[in-house]
Amino acid sequence: MRKIINNPEHVVDEMMEGYISAYSRYYVKHPDVNGVILKQRRKDKVALVIGGGSGHEPMFSGFVGKGLADAAACGNIFASPDPNTIYQTAKAVEQGKGVLFVYGCYAGDNLNFDMGEEFLNDDGIQTAHVRVWDDVASAPQERIEDRRGIAGDVFVVKIAGAACDAGLELEEVVRVTEKARDNTRTIGVATAPAQLPGVEQPIFTLGEGEIEYGMGLHGERGVLRTTWEDADVLAEKMYKQILDDSDLKTGDEVCVLVNGLGSTTITELAIAFRKVKKLLDADGIKVYDTDLNNYCTSQEMGGFSITLFKLDEELKKYYDMPCYCPYYAKGELTGNTGEAAGGQTEDVQIKSEPEFDVNDVEAAEIVRSKAGILEELNAADARNMLLYIADKIIAKKPYL
């Protein structure tokens, strides 16, 4: 597959240059490493640093923002950032209250972030980390700490950022973030492979008409390869696997993320969510908020993932706190899309002025007599209005 790039060896550097240039009002690049730094940061709080390999955009660089991460340490395509990048990026945003690292649970990330923490500790900076392991297909429940981190990063970063902005101490930020992580479950399905820049072959192969449940973001083997299935069948299988792995029950509230893996359209994500919503309704589980988007991707991989994030009152408080970055926002202006108000909706009442000249005696008389709403419109009134409209259309005929 052809990619819109120049030299494959410069993809990350050029992507970083373009990204920082596009959003220079928010970000600055670290002068020495591939770190995205938020310009306007709150002082006197725990710093939140996220990171991982590039190629999953907008995760991780795209989740630096108000109420989210203070910085992101970015590696090469599908490769962990090196310890120095992690160290330098965190050092740039540390405010004296410590640093929390949030990243997906992968061997390279675990090793390099641990080393980055050691460098910071040597400087007298307090650190902690929360590894995201939401992928239910990657290891059984008894080995949950071996699971991979995938689209569940979105919810964990959201809660961690809010907890930091709330002014919690590092120990408390870790507790809240771990609760968010432990309440998050994801499974994905791949319908087409991804391809690395400059590499001739895709990172895995799928036969014509095949799909794979549980495929990882880097092409890691899934749990089941099967023939093509309709959206409702896919969504139901994925939903049931998440439910079997969680303690969700009737009366619980969840946030839902249907995440595209790179080349899947919003149309398809919406169709998948439609089925998930019906299944949740049938089980008596309330939807508090929903996102359908490509947040955690794998180049041009086809497919999607479903994430369920179980809320309690504490997590809901942090989820509702405002946040903003170019790719993700929550707060008063965005509200939530679910049933937080008991499923009640309010019809929007639009008050509009008449589009005709009220100085026109005939039309104005109709408006005055019917108080603008025309609740008791009779045949004569209707005839007069239609004649008036017809006359206006005829008068504008040269322009139509």
Whereabouts are the PLM-identified features?
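N-terminal loops that bind phosphate or other acidic moieties
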Residues: 1-400
